[in-house]
């Protein structure tokens, strides 16, 4: 999906014009992928706009940086305030927010410690991510495995990890699928190229544990919280790929994907091919909270002030 530019980007504590947010070609991140990032959504609401689970996202950015021995020069509160600042200055909501911390221009070589750390935060309009919409996506099991836990840390949302995601997504696209599902090194279900995955079987909601090379998704955690609140039985356990074929319902979760039903896997229909009752129940609660149509019972929303907000469209 093409990027729609806004006016300002936050860089190292200052708002600068969008077109000036450039980096040098010899920056460490360009050569070695030394970055960590986040994806966050700001939702339009009847009374304005709000960022969904902002502190949790920015804490994960800090955690990802720590795993890669990057000490960010900003506190959690400062980073959260910067997100609000850039949204309110650009006046764009709903929107997608992309904070990124990277090793900049300084030294060449694999050891990154001599290169400075730069932090950017951008926001821009962005719609649905997974093709298929409310009717469900046609996806496949990828021939590419997710990264082994002793090679790349899955708990870090690092730019370099997404080279693996690109292989999964491109393979799916070439073969006519909306998305691919990666297995871990033991052949168990891990996640999509950029989404966590859930399956429903006989009324029980299953999702792979983080030990299956899955990212600790904020939306994943939100869905687990919602499901337990709704009284749904939830099990975090390893899932063989064939369970996805015989599941009653399967759906993706993620900041970009939100809650996205899956219609078929490897051209095998999931259930009757339509979004199932539990998927709808969870999605209704998720979007209801995010769009301000239901109470913020879990304290997930950070209000922002913008002059114009697009109407809520769930």
PLM regions with names:
Residues 94-96, 177-178:
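Short secondary-structure junction motifs
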Residues 104:
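Active-site loop/lid in soluble adenylation, ligation, and acyl-transfer enzymes
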Residues 1-85, 107-314:
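Helix-start/capping segments and mature chain N-termini
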